[in-house]
Amino acid sequence: MHRLRNKATLITGGTSGIGLATARRFLEEGARVAITGTNEGRLEEARKTLGDNVLIIAADAGSVAAQEDIARQLGAAFGKLDAVFVNAGIVDLRPLADWSEAAFDRSVAIDLKGPYFLVKALVPLLSNPASIILSGSVNAHMGMAGTHVYSLAKAGMISLARTLSGELIGRGIRANVISPGPIDTPLNDKLGLGPAETKARANAVVGMVPAGRFGTAEEIANAVVFLASDECRFMVGSEMLIDGGMNIM
């Protein structure tokens, strides 16, 4: 069953983790796929993994100019866009006292400002119907120390799904947000922790999850396929929490 047959799609941050898993699933479901990333080496590895039919775009997720260039490249390659998964982001965790203005601006640029201006640039390409899928987080609903800037950006994405839907649904464009809990992806390796700290953190996180484990990138990707498909046409401005029950604690 090809639920995304011939749909033109974009996945930002598509070189690893949830983004790469979603690109695989989109291809399996018959979609035409473009992905973005910042690291040239990982972009090339993704090309090898996904195949030469995938459009690979190098782009800084926090740059407004880069988002506009993504739209230009997609317009030239696809002419239209049926679904976009705005997945690129960073997780910068630190105590309140350790935040500088520069660090704050960079984190918000990648996790909120860039996505906002990407959607703005893509709207002229979006079909009727079309699906915008934003990346939120269970952290937006929790008061976890050190997640200040990440959580506020993700709360912004949850709100953005609603306001975009309010403005665009008349054109057949729906926006929803998927909010994962702790997922076992390479992003966890970018926190700068040593092996012992990483293990201790993982154990602490799992202790907060009623399901008793990390989620997988594939579990999130399966949900994104649903949100991108025509099965989801009556779901508008909603949030899908996939967190092993973490939000109920």
Describe the predicted segments one by one.
Residues 124-125, 166-170, 233:
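Alpha-helical segment proximal to the catalytic Tyr-Lys
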Residues 95-96, 103-108, 205:
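Substrate-binding pocket helix/loop in short-chain dehydrogenase/reductase
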Residues 137:
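Residue(s) in the substrate-gating loop at a strand-loop-helix junction
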Residues 59-69, 101, 218-219:
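The beta1-alpha1 cofactor-binding region of Rossmann-like NAD(H)/NADP(H)-dependent oxidoreductases
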Residues 8, 15-16:
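Conserved glycine-rich cofactor-binding loop
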Residues 119, 153, 161:
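Active-site helix of classical SDR
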Residues 142, 225, 232, 236-249:
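Short C-terminal tail/terminal secondary-structure segment
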